[in-house]
């Protein structure tokens, strides 16, 4: 059976921090699924279609990465793909508190599921999609925070 990991997120937009985690975690799995969440409750800046297209462009050089859109429970998605490991990033203490709760909730729904947490590399530690959206909203230049392939998307906003 293939070793599969799932890296879920809203990716609104995808950042260099996300790509760093995709790069490092893709080396641990035969296949890494990047699952773009619908997340209507978060009121995303970019549509699901745009977010999926951005992440596909940004990961096209990764041979073992597949990008999908999903809605519903992550634990169910993991079962569907026969995945036993979720990949998550942790930047700050508040991320840890939230991610720990989510990890336990997912484990309670799918007992075979484990969560693997990645700390960002130093140069990406401060980057978040929220910061990128704020810079964009104030007409600033966020090109150094996102993959070059997606800059045309965010420069239109």
From Swiss-Prot:
Site, as annotated: Transition state stabilizer: 18
Record InterPro entries: Cyt_trans-like, PPAT, Rossmann-like_a/b/a_fold
Disulfide-bonded cysteines: none
Top EC category: transferase
Record: residues binding substrate: 10, 42, 74, 88
Subcellular localization(s) per the UniProt record: Cytoplasm
This protein's GO CC annotations: cytoplasm
Keyword Metal-binding: no
CDD domains (UniProt xref): PPAT (cd02163)
Pathway participation: Cofactor biosynthesis; coenzyme A biosynthesis; CoA from (R)-pantothenate: step 4/5
Keyword annotations from UniProtKB, A to Z: ATP-binding, Coenzyme A biosynthesis, Cytoplasm, Magnesium, Nucleotide-binding, Nucleotidyltransferase, Transferase
Known cofactor(s): Mg(2+)
Positions with a binding annotation for ATP: 10-11, 18, 89-91, 99, 124-130
One Gene Ontology biological process: coenzyme A biosynthetic process
Pfam families to which the protein is assigned, alphabetical: CTP_transf_like
One GO MF term attached to the UniProt entry: ATP binding
EC number: 2.7.7.3
Reaction catalysis annotation: (R)-4'-phosphopantetheine + ATP + H(+) = 3'-dephospho-CoA + diphosphate
Similarity comment: family membership: Belongs to the bacterial CoaD family.
HAMAP family documented for this protein: PPAT_bact
Subunit structure: Homohexamer.
Annotated function: Reversibly transfers an adenylyl group from ATP to 4'-phosphopantetheine, yielding dephospho-CoA (dPCoA) and pyrophosphate.
The protein's name: Phosphopantetheine adenylyltransferase
Species of the source: Helicobacter acinonychis (strain Sheeba)
Taxonomic lineage: Bacteria, Pseudomonadati, Campylobacterota, Epsilonproteobacteria, Campylobacterales
């Amino acid at each position: 059976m293939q070793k599969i990991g799932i890296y879920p997120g809203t990716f609104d937009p995808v950042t260099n921090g996300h790509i760093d985690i995709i790069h490092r975690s893709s080396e641990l799995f035969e296949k890494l699924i990047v699952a773009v969440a619908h997340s209507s409750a978060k009121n995303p800046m970019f549509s699901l279609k745009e977010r999926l297209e951005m992440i596909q462009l940004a990961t096209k050089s990764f041979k073992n990465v597949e990008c999908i859109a999903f809605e519903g429970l992550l634990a169910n998605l993991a079962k569907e793909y026969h995945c036993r490991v979720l990949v998550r990033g942790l930047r700050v203490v508040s991320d840890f508190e939230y991610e720990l709760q989510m990890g336990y909730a997912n484990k309670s729904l799918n007992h075979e599921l484990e969560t693997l947490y990645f700390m960002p590399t130093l140069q990406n530690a401060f980057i978040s999609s929220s910061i990128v959206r704020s810079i964009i909203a104030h007409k600033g230049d966020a090109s150094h925070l996102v993959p070059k392939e997606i800059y045309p998307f965010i420069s239109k906003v």
